[in-house]
Amino acid sequence: MINDYFPMEVGEEKVRSERMLLTKVEDGKYMMSADSVKFLVLHCSATRCNQDYSVEDLRRDHKARGFRDIGYHFYVRRDGSMTKHRRLLEVGAHARPYNRCSIGVCYEGGLDENGKPCNTMTKEQSNRLADLFRNLRIAFPKAKIVGHRDLPGTTPKECPCLDTAEWAKARLLGCSFQRIVRICLRKDGNLK
């Protein structure tokens, strides 16, 4: 977690209580400006690494949850192909209550063959995501790269099933894919 204690800062805004954090209304369609983007949030689709999860599958599932369309701004498939689903300053539907101050990026996978949370990111996904986050950091230099599970006040889950801070630090500094996999796993082979 980033911080479990209140008061806390979300971006540059002081939040006095969990109630204040959770009751913020996301009533606008667009964020105010690039300065509104405080977080670049990495997600996983929470699908098995041996299961194909197409854009159409993602759209169907998000609409079934009541979203008007896919809630993420970007979706990266196992082969490294990427699709864009929201304009950059359009409010997403991926990490409530942070949707009005974040960009959501999802990679296909996140579960092993048995359905357990696991870093299943392929080399192609890692490369594409690194390029995307580099470009997003240029557009939003104040934004912090975080995993969904790192945001206090969101639904407790393992998403994105890896240590996002370590992955981002390694990838944005140009480490090899194998080194990144080692960084994101504990010595016992489980997620950090």
Model-derived regions: residue spans:
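Basic/polar, cationic surfaces and motifs that engage anionic cell-wall
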Residues: 1-41, 45, 78-82, 87, ...
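N-terminal carbohydrate-binding/catalytic regions of secreted carbohydrate-active enzymes
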Residues: 46-57, 61, 86
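Short glycine-biased active-site loop of nucleotidyltransferases that positions the nucleotide triphosphate
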Residues: 94-97
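Structured segments of extracytoplasmic/periplasmic soluble domains
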Residues: 57-65, 132-139
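A short acidic/small-residue loop/turn micro-motif
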Residues: 90-91
